[in-house]
UniProtKB/Swiss-Prot annotation:
SUPFAM superfamilies on file: Translation proteins SH3-like domain
Family: Belongs to the universal ribosomal protein uL24 family.
InterPro entries attached to this UniProt entry: KOW, Rib_uL2_dom2, Ribosomal_uL24_CS, Ribosomal_uL24_euk/arc, Ribosomal_uL24_KOW, Translation_prot_SH3-like_sf
GO process terms (BP): cytoplasmic translation; ribosomal large subunit biogenesis
CDD domains: KOW_RPL26 (cd06089)
Region (Disordered): 1-24
Molecular-function GO term, any one: RNA binding
Keyword Ribosomal protein: yes
Gene Ontology cellular component terms for the protein in this record: cytosolic large ribosomal subunit
PROSITE patterns for the chain: RIBOSOMAL_L24
Protein name: Large ribosomal subunit protein uL24
Keyword annotations from UniProtKB, A to Z: Ribonucleoprotein, Ribosomal protein
Amino acid sequence: MKVNPFVSSDSGKSRKAHFNAPSHERRRIMSAPLTKELRTKHGIRAIPIRTDDEVVVMRGRHKGNTGRVLRCYRKKFVIHIDKITREKANGSTVHIGIHPSKVAITKLKLDKDRRALVERKAAGRSRVTGILKGKHTDETVN
């Protein structure tokens, strides 16, 4: 059952919104999860991917390959990774596009703005988990 009457559950409208999304919304759509080590270190689960992040491919034909993000191609919702290429019929090599949800970030490129973003997300997440943590004790639960 639909909870919010102002949000459409029409799949066609959802797809239209996704594929006609402006660039700043595509940035958020193109988020990638962090590895377990980074997740515990920074206290966040996922972050929008950017050039110069180091990633490992988690799904598909190139599973297990690691590399640096060369380009975030927002128009096609893909990223290009430095070591993942294929040879064309004319002999030239091209980078293969991979969706950011199919990779995990192993090393973040942190500048001052991105560090602030990570800290802001971690603070909000810790506030929410702090509220939920310890809500029920063994005595209150039968």
